[in-house]
């Protein structure tokens, strides 16, 4: 009767409110990302660089995704020296790598492993984010850093196509470079190189 109808209405309203909140969060993320990219483009951001411990930064990123990893039954594996320092703006660079790790979560199934490794090279420092997910379609590989690019092959319907372009902009603002390597059905690897970290 009436009470049942009311229950249905209440749950519908709650569901709608939940969806609206999700949508608002999505729009807020979009606006924030757009503002950040625009400011980076305009050179309006002054990076506050300090010698940062890379292992500490990566552990913070792992912690940021710990809840999601548990929920989705995925694993983050960290590997690298505890004593490596990178001259960078910790907040900005953490956000860039965060976006790459989020991308790995968005494109992997339950049980996936996401590896974050870092090492010193003769010319600088390298950070790699690698997953064993669905991989990137060959048609998409050259477009993934384009703003608002949405793959027609992707199952991710919530993405806004700004996470990776923002990551690239931040890495390049640090004098770094990012490359992607992917095999369909096998996974994706993002390699970030920073030249001579003491002089970035």
Tell me the role of every PLM-derived stretch.
Residues 12, 42-47, 85-88:
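Conserved micro-motifs of the catalytic ATP-binding
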Residues 22-27:
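Short alpha-helical segment of the dimerization/phosphotransfer core of two-component systems
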Residues 48-51, 70, 75-84:
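Conserved catalytic submotifs in the C-terminal HATPase_c
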Residues 54, 135-146:
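Short helix N-cap motif at coil->helix boundaries in the Bergerat
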Residues 104-105:
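Short helix-loop "hinge" at the ATP-lid/N-box region of the Bergerat-fold HATPase_c
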Residues 111-123:
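Short beta-strand/loop element within the Bergerat-fold HATPase_c
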Residues 175-176:
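Conserved glycine-rich
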């Amino acid at each position: 009767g009436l009470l049942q109808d009311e229950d249905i209405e209440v749950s519908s309203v709650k569901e709608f409110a939940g969806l609206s909140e999700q949508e608002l969060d999505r729009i807020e993320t979009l606006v924030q990302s757009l503002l950040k990219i625009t400011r980076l483009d305009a050179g309006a951001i002054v990076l506050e660089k300090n010698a940062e411990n890379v292992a500490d930064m990566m552990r913070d990123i792992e912690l940021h995704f710990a809840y999601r990893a548990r929920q989705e039954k995925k694993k983050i594996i960290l590997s690298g020296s505890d004593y490596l320092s990178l001259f960078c703006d910790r907040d900005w660079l953490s956000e860039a790598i965060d976006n790459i790790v989020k991308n790995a979560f968005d494109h992997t199934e339950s049980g996936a492993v996401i590896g974050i490794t870092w090492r010193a090279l003769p010319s600088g420092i390298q950070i790699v984010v690698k997953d064993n997910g669905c991989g990137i379609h060959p048609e998409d590989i050259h477009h993934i850093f384009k703003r608002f690019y949405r793959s027609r092959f992707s199952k991710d319907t919530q993405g806004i196509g700004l996470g990776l372009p923002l990551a690239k902009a931040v890495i390049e603002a640090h004098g770094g470079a990012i490359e992607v390597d992917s095999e369909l059905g096998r996974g994706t690897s993002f390699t970030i190189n920073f030249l001579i970290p003491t002089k970035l």
